[in-house]
Amino acid sequence: MAPKRKSGVSKCETKCTKACPRPAPVPKLLIKGGMEVLDLVTGPDSVTEIEAFLNPRMGQPPTPESLTEGGQYYGWSRGINLATSDTEDSPENNTLPTWSMAKLQLPMLNEDLTCDTLQMWEAVSVKTEVVGSGSLLDVHGFNKPTDTVNTKVISTPVEGSQYHVFAVGGEPLDLQGLVTDARTKYKEEGVVTIKTITKKDMVNKDQVLNPISKAKLDKDGMYPVEIWHPDPAKNENTRYFGNYTGGTTTPPVLQFTNTLTTVLLDENGVGPLCKGEGLYLSCVDIMGRRVTRNYDVHHWRGLPRYFKITLRKRWVKNPYPMASLISSLFNNMLPQVQGQPMEGENTQVEEVRVYDGTEPVPGDPDMTRYVDRFGKTKTVFPGN
């Protein structure tokens, strides 16, 4: 007799007698840019687009405008002066390309700052491109000729090292200082150097990453590109993009289109939040160098950059309690004074007494009592 086939149902299997309980839903907390993000703001006026441009700051300021008194160098640097030795390198300010930056003041969203939630502008995307690359086709100017023997040649076009960076954020761009040679003597006026920030001469650590050599891009045309670089350890509320191509005779390579959109959202779907209704734009676009025909002087060439930023409104939790706002208001009303030290290592405070309630008359009125860091009352017994 053939054996019987066992049932396919396992005897060890247990069935749920009732539905499994579901975890209770809780609000998801997301922190970005120092604000607690809540939700988007919907509506017909919840999205805004802003178009702006930044002009290059290659060393020559916008003024004077006269084309015979320095205005002809606007968009260029002045002639680069070389070091005379390893220890004698002092570049002129007008030969140093610097960062371009601007702050756009956005429409105010909150009339009542006492609410638990506030509206903020959030940068969602940007369309950007360098403007004027066709001007680099000029080969009939008074530049160094491509052949010094044959006279029927063209002028050498702009070529060499190229550097392109742009940034969009709700706060100024954070910068990290780093130089090629810490012995370089930059001018102390007209530009912001590492010495300007640290109040000390540069050291060997400034040739690598020195944690104290940091700054914020708060001035246009003041931060040299060869000194200050985007800080990857910061810039939580800023998005920056860039590339560098080196070489002495590298031809410029540039793509441009009005169809490319760069998304500014992070992995959590949140873009830079504009604190105080301020949007910050920064950029550097160095196309290379030209060499003049008569003196073989090199000039950096920069081009402007166009921005089209899309912003939307977002609800955030109010990070500023009313108590702190009122306290800050009263503190700012008081005059700022500079007196003798009453805090720190050189404090001149002798003794502080705090009374709370009543107690029996102590037999030793000079005994020392204090509250330690754990909140416990301590009594110091007199020594011999």
Curated annotation (Swiss-Prot):
Complex and partners: Homomultimer; disulfide-linked. The virus capsid is composed of 72 icosahedral units, each one composed of five disulfide-linked copies of VP1. Interacts with minor capsid proteins VP2 and VP3.
Domain of life assignment: Viruses
Signal peptide stretch: none
Any one GO molecular function term: structural molecule activity
UniProt similarity note: Belongs to the polyomaviruses coat protein VP1 family.
Location in the cell: Virion; Host nucleus
One Gene Ontology biological process: caveolin-mediated endocytosis of virus by host cell
Location of region: C-terminal arm: 322-384
Modified residues (Phosphothreonine): 358
Record-linked Pfam families: Polyoma_coat
CC annotations in GO: host cell nucleus; T=7 icosahedral viral capsid
Further comment found in the protein's record: The virus attaches to the surface of cells by recognition of oligosaccharides terminating in alpha(2,3)-linked sialic acid.
Protein name: Major capsid protein VP1
Function: Forms an icosahedral capsid with a T=7 symmetry and a 40 nm diameter. The capsid is composed of 72 pentamers linked to each other by disulfide bonds and associated with VP2 or VP3 proteins. Interacts with terminal alpha(2,3)-linked sialic acids on the cell surface to provide virion attachment to target cell. This attachment induces virion internalization predominantly through caveolin-mediated endocytosis. Once attached, the virion is internalized by caveolin-mediated endocytosis and traffics to the endoplasmic reticulum.
Protein's organism: Murine polyomavirus (strain A3)
Organism classification: Viruses, Monodnaviria, Shotokuvirae, Cossaviricota, Papovaviricetes
Keywords noted in UniProt: Capsid protein, Caveolin-mediated endocytosis of virus by host, Disulfide bond, Host nucleus, Host-virus interaction, Late protein, Phosphoprotein, T=7 icosahedral capsid protein, Viral attachment to host cell, Viral penetration into host cytoplasm, Virion, Virus endocytosis by host, Virus entry into host cell
Domain free text: A DNA-binding domain overlapping a bipartite nuclear localization signal is present in the N-terminal region of the protein and is required for efficient virus formation.
Position of sequence motif Bipartite nuclear localization signal: 4-18
